[in-house]
Each structure stands twice: as structure tokens, then as C-alpha cells.
Regions:
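Well-ordered alpha-helical scaffold segments within catalytic/enzyme domains
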Residues: 296-315, 319-333, 379, 390-408, ...
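Carbohydrate-recognition beta-sandwich/jelly-roll modules
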Residues: 2-392, 396-422
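Aromatic-lined, polymer-binding surfaces characteristic
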Residues: 384, 445-462, 490-495, 499-514
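Long alpha-helical HEAT/HEAT-like repeat alpha-solenoid scaffolds in very large eukaryotic proteins
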Residues: 516, 530-594
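Alpha-helical junction/boundary sensor with strong preference for TPR arrays
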Residues: 309, 350, 402, 427, ...
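Exposed, low-structure sequence patches enriched in small/polar residues
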Residues: 495, 535, 579-589, 599-635, ...
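Glycine- and aromatic-rich loop/turn segments at beta-sheet edges
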Residues: 250-287, 348-379, 424-444, 486-505, ...
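Active-site lining segments of carbohydrate-active enzymes
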Residues: 369-381, 393-473, 522, 534-544
Length: 682
């Protein structure tokens, strides 16, 4: 790497062509200062600011990655802002901005008060908002220019990143402008606030931080980002996450699942959506077969584990309480019997033939398509493709599992057939299974990826049908048409609108498509499906935390030494972490197995390890009582954001017991244990 001074405050880094330009400035007492001299050596640059001090850069060329270690040596007392400014030769072409887990295609799809290009052309975001600190990428159709930083370890040095005309600027201390997004309904105007400063004492201050730069020939933005992550992973620390052992993890998760089962008063059962959530518990007063509760998947897990013998007192007690709750014998069929009662409960959700509304309001005795928090309450009386796809897939699996315990349950398969017929007839000419449908099979909303769950459901049902069954041919035709549509979404990068409690670009859109493509590949082994799956997998990587982000040491998460590495964030609308990574890990392992691309196996391992954290045990119930053993919080608020706009619950706070976390993580664990057991070795 050659270093050329191009102005009194700038140097250009070159190899065979221009790599980037570095600008050296300091802000002292509100005024921008430039160096009086730049001292350039073979692999270092020193900017001399006279009595203020120096900035010293050491450069390390690691192939396609440049590692820049910067030391600020500040000698004069006062207020400072530190800037790290990178730019590249963009040939005056328009740059598109990408920030992992935060800014995708200008965030212009959806509804909500989250940051977008429509609200402002320029933004600055704190490093704690993105899955790699201060990571941002500019693409101009010819090059991909990316920067990132190691995480801050002190609140004073938490940085922010903002795009510039030809580059990116990292500032310390960080600030968010022109707005700070702090909750689903909270976008705080910060345009009139003074920028924060670093107060340097009379004895001076030295501070060192490492930055990472990449300048790639343009492939796709997401492909370039994945390459950047792969290069960075070779340099990042490999500290293991502190979590409980898998045997106890499994027992406690099953304990929580059993304790969520409720008797409906008529001998049937459902899963409680969540409990003990204080001031926001009213939000959780419904159950469902799918999505936020996943009662039917929970039933499938119970049925599959009916012969499992407990090793902990907590699990034994949960089984005994369950038997008492339903006046059953605590034997090897207990969990299967209760699973059947859950399945039977949701047979009531069929409003007319093949029209399935699986959300049930426990207070008002109302069935609906989706009754939770969302941006579109007008859809509650319709049926949703995601909910139907999830529920029917689990009905098929539950019927097969109960059969192994001697329980023939043809009503579940009959219902699945009727719902399948509904979607075969409703499927749009494009191949889409839509999003929201009226009871008459008319589309209410066709945007997003919800219909991919119908594709996965069909892939689960098809192997059970005989070749003489006319439904089989119809389903095969439908999934092929659906693949044409959803593969085009993946090609266009249109990963949008999958979660029902938000309306934005979200990671679950990528997971839905990846799962469908892999399910269809498992059925037919068409290599084209793996190409489409790669596009979805690349999109998902941005939501996986690659570093341990800064957490205030005195916060709940900080006190528990919680690590963000391997955790996943939700969407551009929901800036919190969750444990969805167990489900993603299984899909990544399938993809890696079929393609040999071990990058995705490595990413899967990160997520699996992260999901061992923060599970309530017999000795630590995470602030609750022993009836919550096995609960794991849904929302981990690592940054300045909270779902319900509660300012006290930001930056290191965890909260919300909700059934989907228990069900999804336990079910994914079972799949990984069956198919990829080596990934669970401790």
C-alpha cells in the first residue's frame, strides 16, 4: 500500500489503483482544526496538531481488508470531537448507502416512523444500532466501499457513522441526527441539540481504536458485505459465549413450554402467548396457532418428546402440574395427549371451508387473522398467508408425530388439505400466495414474503399424498409457480413485509424465502433453488451481530456479561435483538451441507452459541419466580430503542416473556440435534 499526501490534511492510499483517502481533522472547542504537518512513513501516518497533540495511524494490509489502528494523543485540556473520515474515488457516480441491520434500499418500503430516505437525505447513527460497529457501505455500480470499527469499550467513546458525499465519517463521541429512532412510535428530533464532546483533562488523553476498510470491485451489495464479514471474522476475537450446557438448556426450555400450556375450560388446550409482562401484559392476552405464539409447533414438540424422561426437578414438577391441570396420568403419553388437545382446540379456527383464522382473543372470545400489535388493524378480519402456512405445516407434522404414539388424527390432515385447496385456487397468476385474503379468496394485500410459508407448507404435505391424488399435482404446479415469483423477489432484493407486528424490511423475509427454497430443494434437488437460497442467505447475514457491541456495565445485560455476538436483530423498524438465530442456524446448516459453503456453517455456530445465553434456570430465574424456569426474553434492548417507547428500558434492558421464543428455539434445537449434532458439542 502506497501513501501519497494530496493536501495539507489528506493522504491517498493506493495499491494498483486508488484505495481510499484519509482526512485528518480535530474539533477543539467547537472549531475545526487541521494539522500543521503530516509525517508519512512506509506503513504509518502521523498528523501533528501542534499543542493539541497528534493523530497516529498504523496500517496493516490484509488482502482485501485494510486494518487501520488510530491513536489520538491529546495534550491540551478542553472539549474535543474526534473524526475519522474515509472517502474513495467514486468517479462522481451516485452512491447507494447500505448499513447492516439498519438501512436497506433507503428503507422506503413499509409504514412506521423508522428512519428512511423519505424523512431525510442524511442520517447519523450510533455504532450500537448496527451488527458491526460503525459499518456502512457505499456502492456506485462499479465499487463497494465499506468501513467498520471495533466496538467501543467505554460509554465516552461510543461512536456514530454518517455518509458523506464521497465517503463515510465516524465521529467520537457519537450522535444521532436529524432524528433518533427510540421506539415504534418515537422518532425524536435531535436537529437542535448540541453535539456531544469528549472532555480531556489537564493531564491529557490517549485513545486507540481499530478501523476496517474495504474497496471491492462491485458484485452485489450483499455479496460484498458477506465477503467483508468473512474477512473480518478472521481478525475478530473467538471468545466463547457464556451460556448454560445444552442438556440443562433443553430441559429448561421444555419446562417453560409445558408451563405455557393452558386448559381452555372444556378440556382442550392452547399456549399462553406470554405472562408476567407487567404494564404491557394486556398486549399478550391472546393465543394463536402460529406466528407470535406458535401453539401448533409447540404441540408438535410436546408430542415428539412425550417419552422423554426428565432429569431436573423443574421438568418433573412441570409434567406433574400438567397432568393435574388436565386430570391425566403422568406417563409416557402425557405430552402427546396434551399435544392432541392443542391441535383440537385450533380446529375451531376454520371459519368456513379452508378459511383459517388462528388468532384467538382470550378476553373477548374473538377469532381473527391477526390480533396483535401491527400497522394494519384493518386486516384482522382476513386470513394471513404466513399464519396459515406456519399452522398447516405444523398440523401435518403433528399428525405424523401423533401417529407414532398410536393416535390417528385424520382431522388435522383433512383441514390441511382444505386450506391447501384454498391457496391453490387463490394463488395469483404471478405465482404469489399473497399476504392477506378475504374469506372469499380475494386478495386484500399481496405485498411481501408471507406467501412463502404456504410454499413450505405445500412441500411438507406433498410427500404424504399419493400420485393418484389430484391434490398432489395441483400442489406441485403451485409450488413451481410460487418459486418463479419468490425467486424473483430474492433476485430483486425485495425482502420486505414478513413480520405482522411491523411493516418494513425485516430479517424474517429472508428466512421465509430461504426456508421455502431449501424445502423445495429437499423435495426436488434442482440446483437453481440453491442459487436463489444463496441470495436469501446473503440478505440474512446483515442481521447477525459479528461483534460484542457496547453495553453499559451497570445495565441488566451488562451486569450479566451478555454478549451480542451471534445475536440477531429484527428489522429496520424494530431495533432490538432476539433469539431467532436458532431457526436461522438450522437453515444455514442445511444450505452449507448442500453447497459446501462453510461460511454459513460458521455463522450458524455463532447464532447457536449466542442462544445459550439468558435462559432462566432453577437458581436464576432472571428476576422472576420458579414458575418461569426456562423463559428467555424476547426483547434485548442493546441500543437507544424500546418496543413500547419506554425510555427506562433502553440500552441494556431485557424484557417480555412470549411463547414463540420458547417454541422456536426448542424446535430448532431438536432439528439441529437430529441433522447436525456436532454443532451442539460443547
Amino acid at each position: 500500500m502506497h501513501i501519497l499526501q494530496t493536501s495539507p490534511e489528506k493522504v491517498e492510499l493506493r495499491s494498483s489503483e486508488s484505495f481510499c483517502t484519509l482526512a485528518y481533522t480535530l474539533t477543539f472547542e467547537g472549531k475545526r482544526r487541521t494539522p500543521c504537518a503530516l509525517i508519512i512513513k512506509e506503513a504509518s501516518i502521523t498528523a501533528d496538531f501542534g499543542p493539541l497533540g497528534t493523530i497516529e495511524d498504523r496500517l496493516l494490509d490484509r488482502g482485501n481488508l485494510l486494518v487501520l489502528t488510530r491513536s489520538w494523543n491529546l495534550r491540551q485540556q478542553g472539549s474535543y470531537r474526534l473524526q475519522v473520515a474515509f472517502s474513495y474515488d467514486d468517479q462522481e457516480l451516485e452512491n447507494k448507502l447500505f448499513i447492516p441491520a439498519l438501512w436497506y434500499q433507503d428503507n422506503n418500503k413499509g409504514k412506521g416512523c423508522f428512519p428512511s430516505a423519505e424523512r431525510s437525505a442524511n442520517w447519523s447513527f450510533l455504532e450500537t444500532r448496527m451488527s458491526i460497529p460503525c459499518c456502512a457501505q457505499l456502492s456506485n455500480g462499479q465499487r463497494l466501499f465499506t468501513c467498520a470499527s471495533e466496538p467501543a469499550t467505554d460509554q465516552r467513546f461510543v461512536a456514530s457513522v454518517a455518509p458523506d458525499r464521497h465517503g463515510l465519517i465516524i465521529s467520537i463521541p457519537g450522535s444521532e441526527w436529524p432524528y433518533s429512532y427510540q421506539g415504534k412510535q418515537s422518532l425524536v428530533d435531535t436537529s437542535s441539540l448540541a453535539l456531544p464532546c469528549l472532555e480531556v483533562p489537564s493531564q491529557g488523553l490517549s485513545y486507540t481504536r481499530t478501523f476496517y476498510l474495504s474497496n471491492q470491485k462491485a458484485g452485489s451489495s450483499l455479496e460484498g458485505y458477506c465477503q467483508f464479514v468473512q474477512q473480518l471474522s478472521e481478525l475478530s476475537p473467538k471468545d466463547k459465549t457464556e451460556g448454560i450446557g445444552w442438556e440443562h438448556w433443553f430441559e429448561y426450555k421444555l419446562t417453560r413450554l409445558i408451563n405455557l400450556v393452558q386448559n381452555d375450560g372444556n378440556g382442550l388446550a392452547y399456549l399462553l402467548m406470554g405472562e408476567g409482562n407487567g404494564e404491557v401484559q394486556d398486549v399478550y392476552a391472546f393465543t394463536s396457532a402460529s406466528f407470535l405464539v406458535k401453539s401448533l409447533q409447540g404441540a408438535q414438540e410436546l408430542a415428539s418428546l412425550t417419552k422423554y424422561q426428565p432429569k431436573t426437578k423443574a421438568l418433573a414438577a412441570a409434567r406433574a402440574n400438567l397432568a393435574t391441570k388436565f386430570s391425566l396420568v403422568d406417563n409416557h403419553l402425557l405430552l402427546a395427549e396434551v399435544a392432541k388437545r392443542i391441535g383440537d382446540f385450533f380446529l375451531q379456527a376454520e371459519r368456513s371451508e379452508g378459511v383459517f383464522q388462528d388468532n384467538y382473543d382470550l378476553v373477548n372470545d374473538i377469532w381473527g387473522g391477526y390480533l396483535g400489535i401491527g400497522e394494519h388493524p384493518e386486516f384482522k378480519s382476513m386470513v394471513n398467508s404466513r399464519c396459515n402456512g406456519e399452522a398447516m405445516k405444523q398440523y401435518v407434522l403433528l399428525a405424523r408425530t401423533l401417529q407414532k404414539s398410536g393416535m390417528e388424527e385424520l382431522s388435522y390432515l383433512s383441514l390441511a388439505r382444505r386450506v391447501a385447496r384454498f391457496y391453490c385456487e387463490a394463488q395469483l397468476s404471478s405465482g404469489s400466495f399473497g399476504r392477506w385474503w378475504t374469506e372469499k379468496g380475494k386478495p386484500g394485500d399481496i405485498q411481501g414474503t408471507n406467501g412463502a410459508y404456504i410454499g413450505s407448507f405445500f412441500c411438507t404435505l406433498i410427500p404424504l399424498l399419493s400420485d393418484e391424488d389430484p391434490l398432489k399435482a395441483d400442489l406441485l404446479s403451485a409450488v413451481h409457480q410460487a418459486y418463479s415469483f419468490y425467486s424473483e423477489l430474492a433476485y430483486e432484493g425485495a425482502f420486505y413485509g414478513d413480520t405482522l407486528d411491523a411493516d418494513s424490511c425485516d430479517k424474517e423475509a429472508g428466512v421465509a424465502l430461504l426456508s421455502f427454497f431449501l424445502d423445495l430443494y429437499d423435495l426436488e434437488h434442482d440446483k437453481r433453488l440453491l442459487e436463489s437460497a444463496k441470495l436469501a442467505a446473503q440478505f440474512i447475514v446483515q442481521w447477525i451481530w459479528q461483534f460484542d457491541s457496547f453495553l453499559p456495565p451497570g445495565s441488566e445485560l451488562g451486569q450479566r456479561n451478555f454478549r451480542t455476538r451471534g445475536m440477531t436483530s429484527v428489522s429496520v423498524a424494530h431495533h432490538h435483538l432476539d433469539f431467532y438465530g436458532m431457526a436461522i442456524a438450522y437453515e444455514f446448516l442445511r444450505y452449507a451441507h448442500w453447497t459446501g459453503d462453510m461460511f454459513y456453517q460458521e455463522q450458524a455456530k455463532l447464532m447457536i452459541e449466542a442462544c445459550r445465553q439468558l435462559v432462566a434456570t432453577e437458581t436464576d430465574q432472571l428476576g422472576r419466580d420458579e414458575t418461569y424456569i426456562g423463559w428467555q426474553p424476547e426483547q434485548l434492548n442493546h441500543t437507544t430503542w424500546e418496543y413500547f417507547n419506554r425510555t427506562h428500558a433502553m440500552q441494556g434492558y431485557y424484557d417480555i416473556d412470549i411463547a414463540w421464543v420458547t417454541v422456536l428455539t426448542l424446535g430448532s434445537y431438536q432439528l439441529i440435534l437430529e441433522k447436525f449434532p456436532s454443532m451442539l458439542e460443547e
